[in-house]
């Protein structure tokens, strides 16, 4: 027996072979288009809101980068999770979104920043959100509750972002002395590769106001990001509900137009045995 129980589902739906074949053709066209749209729109959304912090290595600091990136990244994850869970009961919406985002980012980094603009690829490496996305999907799969997913999965999405990226970006925070000035590796790379807007956009990754809390800047930033990610998950879950729910306006026998959200809105005549 197949893990997806395809034969049982088709038998219960009482679909003729022609309808099954047509459904498969529609899926073969629909889902690749959906993936391409998800890669393009999520990448554009992410670059507009968190682009500067995720573009450059010298902007990946311990304060704003762990705050901004998860808050922006959880938005699409939440909406697509609603769509896949409610319509297909598939708990991999967040992982799918993050993988699509990484595909779009790496295409941009290689062809736009490395091949076209000649920046070194390790200076424009994108951050990863896969650990938090996996926690979102696992929480939804195990609890089957969107509110618990928002509180637990959304919190872990913000908390796991910085430690999940630390093996990749940690070495760029090592100190070096350049002509008598103490810099980090990321700051030094930023001074070597001048970008449009410099010096307006030059910033050192070890400067900021969160140090007034005793120096634990990353911990404070991670917990704040986790809290806001919970709220963002809730908001975008309902946005997914608004934009991913089919509805019908049906005119009744007395001429009254009513709003329906189910496929039986136009009656049960098309079903062989009716709806029980």
Curated annotation (Swiss-Prot):
Its EC number is 1.14.99.39. It catalyses: AH2 + NH4(+) + O2 = hydroxylamine + A + H2O + H(+). It is a multi-pass membrane protein. Signal peptide: none annotated. The physiological significance of the two gene copies is still unknown. Cu(+) binds at residues 187, 191, 204. It holds the Pfam family AMO. Part of the ammonia monooxygenase complex, which catalyzes the oxidation of ammonia to hydroxylamine, the first reaction in the process of ammonia oxidation to nitrite. Gene3D superfamilies: Ammonia/particulate methane monooxygenase, subunit A. It comes from the Bacteria. Its cofactor is Cu(+). InterPro entries: NH3/CH4_mOase_suA_sf, NH3_CH4_mOase_A. This is Ammonia monooxygenase alpha subunit. It is found in: Cell membrane; Cytoplasm. GO terms for cellular component: cytoplasm; plasma membrane. Disulfide bonds: none annotated.
